[in-house]
């Protein structure tokens, strides 16, 4: 992909989107579709924050130029031209990153790469809002990922051992970005998610994350590659994990076959949702994620045969 024209300095008003823009830069070569939507999210959010002051107008204008250049380079890529495909692509990518970090966490393997994966997953779920309202599941994943990144980062910084696993996932408090995260001392017991402790990569030493790559599939759940496949033309020397046995597909609910098609009336919205689930399934199969593909196909089948989800 051709290099994009650089952006001017980020106005202070746009501080809340700086990490989304950084994520875009990190994915320019790794996954241009993800990079495109990260910039689109930053553009839309920036417009809502301030589109009138000269420095903000100039920044947004240059960001728009980047978006137009990216869209031209991506051409007829369905993930950009079709929102359903684009949403599925982003959701699957964010989920792979979340599952990689969650698997490392549950196994007690705490490191900077895992912290960044948690935090980046939360940023990508922010980006999914360009397609509309988030699902309840995505909202929970975002809150949990951002809090886990905060908690583990603070523990490691303070020389403490984090508690593995889903601690405090049921808490209602939202996690917001806080520049003072590094100054917060932790109690003996793991804290619950709160607005006073949020992970901010900028608080780490310069270069802490430079060049970090998630090992493809390393320590990730079966059929859940940590790094979404992409074609770069560069051969990786990383050791690949041994082939994993594909788990048996979940049994399909017999009720789906007994529903009478003639007894239900589907709306255009029902057909659109069914199509969305099929697109999600197709995207999951690109990553050999059988479980997610089957789950989405079952959702589509249930909707089409019962008229409900």
Curated annotation (Swiss-Prot):
InterPro entries: Vta1-like (IPR044538), Vta1/CALS_N (IPR039431), Vta1/CALS_N_sf (IPR023175), Vta1_C (IPR041212). Its main location: cytoplasm. Residues 232-245 have a biased composition (Polar residues). It is a peripheral membrane protein. Gene3D superfamilies: Immunoglobulin FC, subunit C, Vacuolar protein sorting-associated protein vta1. Residues 198-309 are annotated as: Interaction with VPS4B. Disulfide bonds: none annotated. GO terms for biological process: late endosome to vacuole transport via multivesicular body sorting pathway; protein transport. Residues 173-254 are annotated as: Disordered. Widely expressed. Expressed in brain, liver, kidney, spleen, lung and heart (at protein level). The modification N-acetylalanine is found at residue 2. The keyword Cell membrane does not apply. Keywords: Acetylation, Cytoplasm, Endosome, Membrane, Protein transport, Transport. It is found in: Cytoplasm; Endosome membrane. Residues 2-186 are annotated as: Interaction with IST1. GO terms for cellular component: cytoplasm; cytosol; endosome membrane; nucleoplasm. Residues 2-75 are annotated as: Interaction with CHMP5. Involved in the endosomal multivesicular bodies (MVB) pathway. MVBs contain intraluminal vesicles (ILVs) that are generated by invagination and scission from the limiting membrane of the endosome and mostly are delivered to lysosomes enabling degradation of membrane proteins, such as stimulated growth factor receptors, lysosomal enzymes and lipids. Thought to be a cofactor of VPS4A/B, which catalyzes disassembles membrane-associated ESCRT-III assemblies. Involved in the sorting and down-regulation of EGFR. Belongs to the VTA1 family. Interacts with VPS4B. Interacts with CHMP1B. Interacts with CHMP2A; the interaction probably involves the open conformation of (polymerized) CHMP2A. Interacts with CHMP3. Interacts with CHMP5; the interaction involves soluble CHMP5. Interacts with IST1. This is Vacuolar protein sorting-associated protein VTA1 homolog. The lineage of its organism: Eukaryota, Metazoa, Chordata, Craniata, Vertebrata. The gene is Vta1.
């Amino acid at each position: 992909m051709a290099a994009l024209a650089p952006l001017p300095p980020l106005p202070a008003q746009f501080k809340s989107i700086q990490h989304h823009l950084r994520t875009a830069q990190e994915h320019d070569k790794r996954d241009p579709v993800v990079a495109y939507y990260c910039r689109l999210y930053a553009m839309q959010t920036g417009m809502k924050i301030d589109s009138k002051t000269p420095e903000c107008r100039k920044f947004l204008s240059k960001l728009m130029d980047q978006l137009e250049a990216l869209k031209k380079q991506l051409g007829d890529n369905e993930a950009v031209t079709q929102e359903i495909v684009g949403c599925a692509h982003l959701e699957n990518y964010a989920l792979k990153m979340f599952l990689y970090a969650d698997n490392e966490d549950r196994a007690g393997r705490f490191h900077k790469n895992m912290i960044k994966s948690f935090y980046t997953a939360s940023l990508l779920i922010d980006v999914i809002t360009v397609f509309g309202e988030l699902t309840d599941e995505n909202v929970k994943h975002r809150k949990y990922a951002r809090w886990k990144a905060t908690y583990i980062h603070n523990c490691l910084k303070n020389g403490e051992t984090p508690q593995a696993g889903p601690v405090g996932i049921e808490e209602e408090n939202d996690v917001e970005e806080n520049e003072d995260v590094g100054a917060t001392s932790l109690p003996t017991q793991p804290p619950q998610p709160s607005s006073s402790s949020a992970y901010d990569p900028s608080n780490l030493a310069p270069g802490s994350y430079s060049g970090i790559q998630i090992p493809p599939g390393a320590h990730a759940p079966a059929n859940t590659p940590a790094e979404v496949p992409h074609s770069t033309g560069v051969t990786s020397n990383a050791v690949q994990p041994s082939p994993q046995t594909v788990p048996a597909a979940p049994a399909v609910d017999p009720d789906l076959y007994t529903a009478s098609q003639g007894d239900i009336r589907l709306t255009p919205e029902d057909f659109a949702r069914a199509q969305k689930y099929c697109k999600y399934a197709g995207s999951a199969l690109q990553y050999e994620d059988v479980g997610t593909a089957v789950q989405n196909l079952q959702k589509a089948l249930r909707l089409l045969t019962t008229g409900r989800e």
